[in-house]
Amino acid sequence: MLIDSHCHLHDREFFTAEQAEEMLEHARKNGVEKIICIGTSHEDSLAAREFANTHENVYWTYGIHPENATEISLSGPRPAGPSPWAAGANSRAAALRNTPTGTFSVAPIGIGEVGLDYHYDGYDRDAQIKLFREMLDLAKEYDLPVSFHVREAYDDFFEIIKDYPEIRGVVHSFTDSKKNLKRILNETNFYIGVNGLATYSTLPTPPLERILLETDAPFLTPVPFRGIINECAYIRNIAEWLSEKLGIDLEIIEKETTKNARKLFGI
């Protein structure tokens, strides 16, 4: 059995409700035991909560993606009106405390995705750092693991997490250097998220005991499905690639990565 530790199946910008149901069924037929829907804004996190609240073995996290840390984006100012991506600390805490009554009524199992993204000049770095610290404070307060989004910002990332030695988590979709992979492995207890990007790149591969499998669906579709929308069922293809890459039986890959996800997220 497999766990997809990072996807966005709840996001109706990419999936209709009917498509999401079909993809859930497809995933289950391909041995995906559980999936985790990752929030990227206040509003999106609430959508993830609602989706998990009505589906068995679906979990959610509360997060604000670094690109949503400011109302300034590459395309200019955000639309006028309420800013769910910039919800205040009280709203964030309330989202963690208050779970709607439903079939499964699940609480969040983590904070994320949160972090730093310096790839685009249009994203305010100071705003990202401020929000990142606020989200880490939430994770500390509620004793929740963190799904980290870090791109071209590892110096600041390592500097900030020094102030949070109790934080545990996973570096989602690691795409950086061997040097920074070594720092993560040696200086933190964080896991590394391995997804479809690894199947067509030359990225360094972490040891199995530090790997979580993820799809990031609908993004980062693995070989041999590149060019079509990604879905949770394709995590099996990532596991098969990893088995070949590491020279380890697929059954062991499934067992160990599932054990890692259960240990981190408590599911």
Range-by-range predicted roles:
Residues 1-267:
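Mid-domain alpha/beta scaffold segments of enzyme catalytic cores
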